[in-house]
Amino acid sequence: MKKLLLVNGPNLNRLGVREVNVYGKGTLATLETDMKHEAEKMGVELECFQSNHEGAIIDRLHEAEDIYEGIILNPGAFTHYSYAIRDAIASISIPVIEVHISNIHQRESFRHESVTAAVCAGQIVGFGFYGYKLALFALMEKLREA
């Protein structure tokens, strides 16, 4: 059975209470449960991880290469400035799909640039929680192509 990793970055533990007009009312627990269920339907095991700490995310990305076949990553605000996370993604050989709940290109100008997207297999933005499912579908297709 394929194993995938879902990584959510800073402040995503606050889903459901943080800026519901931007991120919706769904919680991280709901998102993770829904994603695990979707993965199961595809015959895939999905492990979920969330951290507000850059180093913890980097460590998890490094460890993932030996455990998982691919990663779905929402780096949160680290998207816009974490060259360390960018370099961690670039250093691993498994595909990473970047996902964002909101359309980062329609928000504040500082959110328009992703320093991580260039080293990811793709980026999905603006589809709410459904974007994570799209990322799962895209990642599975990427793995089939390999």
Swiss-Prot record:
Pathway: Metabolic intermediate biosynthesis; chorismate biosynthesis; chorismate from D-erythrose 4-phosphate and phosphoenolpyruvate: step 3/7. Gene3D superfamilies: Dehydroquinase, class II. One of its GO terms (molecular function) is 3-dehydroquinate dehydratase activity. The record marks R18 as: Transition state stabilizer. GO terms for biological process: amino acid biosynthetic process; aromatic amino acid family biosynthetic process; chorismate biosynthetic process; quinate catabolic process. Keywords: Amino-acid biosynthesis, Aromatic amino acid biosynthesis, Lyase. It is an enzyme of class 4 (lyase). It catalyses: 3-dehydroquinate = 3-dehydroshikimate + H2O. PANTHER family: CATABOLIC 3-DEHYDROQUINASE. Homododecamer. This is 3-dehydroquinate dehydratase.
